[in-house]
Amino acid sequence: MSKRDYYEVLGVSKDASERDIKKAYKRLAMKYHPDRTSGDKELETKFKEVKEAYEILTDAQKRQTYDQYGHAAFEQGGGGGGHGGFGGGHGDFGDVFGDVFGDIFGGGGGRRQSRQQRGSDLRYNMDLSLEEAVRGKEVEIKIPTWVGCDPCDGSGAKAGSKPKTCTTCHGAGQVQMRQGFFAVQQTCPTCQGQGQIISNPCDSCHGQGRVEKTKTLSVKIPAGVDTGDRIRLTGEGEAGMHGAPSGDLYVQVSVREHRIFVRDANNLHCEVPISFTTAGLGGEIEVPTLDGRAKLKIPSETQTGKMFRMRGKGVKSVRSGAIGDLICKVVIETPINLNERQRELLEELEESMGKDSSKNRPKEQGFFDGVKKFFDDLTK
C-alpha cells in the first residue's frame, strides 16, 4: 500500500510553517499515542505515520528533499525517517513529545539530540574578480575554528581513561519531570546534557574534545559562479564537542565590479566607443571579450546606443552549462582637439547637406519638428 502524503497525514498545507507542523503533530500524537489507545494496532500504525511525517517535515533538508522527490527519496535507506526508523514497541513517551515541548519548558530537544550536539556551521566570504568567477579556480583559505582534539581523539578524556556514563540520566543527557499528564524532558544538571562524565579530562582540550586552531583548506570554485552563490563544504565547520559531528562550511561568493563588463546572469554587457566616421561609413572594429579580442562589423549609418549581440561570448552557466552572449552597446564619440583643416572638412560636410538635412539627420529633424508643434499649440 502506498504511503500517504506527509502533509496530508498531519493535515497541513505544503507551505505550512514549522510552528504549524509542530502544533498539528502535538494534537495528533496525543490522539493516537499507544498509551492512550489501549493497544489498538490500527491507531498505533497511525501514530507511527504521524511521527514519521513530523520527523521529515521538521528537518529543513529532509523536507526539501521530500518536496522534490517524494517518498522515493527515503526508501531503501535513501533518507531515513521511514517506519523502520522507529524500532519496536511504543517507545519513550518523552521521546515523542520532547522536541515539541522542549522549547516551552526549556528542556531542549529530544533525547536523540542531547548527546550528539553537532558543531556550528561557519561562513567564509569569498571575493572574486569577474575573470576568476567565470573561469573558476582553486583557492586556499585559512579558517579559525574548532577542530577535534588529537591526543584524546575527540573524547575529552585523558589517554588511558574513558568517559563514564552519567548515573543521573543513564546516558540520555536528559531527565524527565512530570507535570500533570505530561512527562517533560529537561537537560540533565549533572552532565549538562552530554550523557557522560569525564573524571580525567584531557590536558590538551580540558575535556571538550576539541581545540581552537586555524585550519587551511583548498576550495574549488566552479566556473560560472556569481554573487550570491554559496558553496557548501560538508563537515568543514566547527567540530562538535566530545566527538560529535562537525558542522558545515559555507563559502559565500561575491564578484567585484569589472571596469569593462557588466554581468547580467550569463550575459555580459559592455559599451564600445566608435568614431563618428565609422558610425557613418561602417567598418570593422575590435572589441574585448573574456577570451581575448574579437572582430565586430559595424554597418553604415549606425546610431549611438545600438546593441550588437555576439553569440557564445558570455558566461557558461554553472548549473546548466549553457553559454550566454556578449552584448555591445556602441557609443559614438564626438571628435575633440580639431585642427584647422579638420574643422574645414566638417564645415564642408555641414554645407554639403544643405538647409534641408532631414534625410541625413531624421531624428534631429523630427525632434525640432516636435518642438515647433509644441510651441505652436501653446500660442493657439
Swiss-Prot record:
Domain J residue range list: 5-70
CXXCXGXG motif repeat ranges per the UniProt record: 149-156, 166-173, 188-195, 202-209
Broad class of where this protein is predominantly found: cytoplasm
GO cellular component: cytoplasm
MF-aspect GO terms: ATP binding; heat shock protein binding; unfolded protein binding; zinc ion binding
Positions contributing to Zn(2+) 1 binding: 149, 152, 202, 205
Tagged with keyword Zinc-finger: yes
Keywords attached to this entry: Chaperone, Cytoplasm, DNA replication, Metal-binding, Repeat, Stress response, Zinc, Zinc-finger
GO biological process, one term: DNA replication
Essential cofactor(s): Zn(2+)
Positions annotated as zinc finger (CR-type): 136-214
Top-level taxon in the UniProt lineage: Bacteria
Places the protein is found: Cytoplasm
Residue positions binding Zn(2+) 2: 166, 169, 188, 191
Cofactor notes: Binds 2 Zn(2+) ions per monomer.
Domain remarks: The J domain is necessary and sufficient to stimulate DnaK ATPase activity. Zinc center 1 plays an important role in the autonomous, DnaK-independent chaperone activity of DnaJ. Zinc center 2 is essential for interaction with DnaK and for DnaJ activity.
NCBIfam families attached to this UniProt entry: DnaJ_bact, PRK10767.1
General function of this protein: Participates actively in the response to hyperosmotic and heat shock by preventing the aggregation of stress-denatured proteins and by disaggregating proteins, also in an autonomous, DnaK-independent fashion. Unfolded proteins bind initially to DnaJ; upon interaction with the DnaJ-bound protein, DnaK hydrolyzes its bound ATP, resulting in the formation of a stable complex. GrpE releases ADP from DnaK; ATP binding to DnaK triggers the release of the substrate protein, thus completing the reaction cycle.
Subunit structure as annotated in this protein's UniProt entry: Homodimer.
Family: Belongs to the DnaJ family.
Name of this protein: Chaperone protein DnaJ
Organism field: Pseudoalteromonas translucida (strain TAC 125)
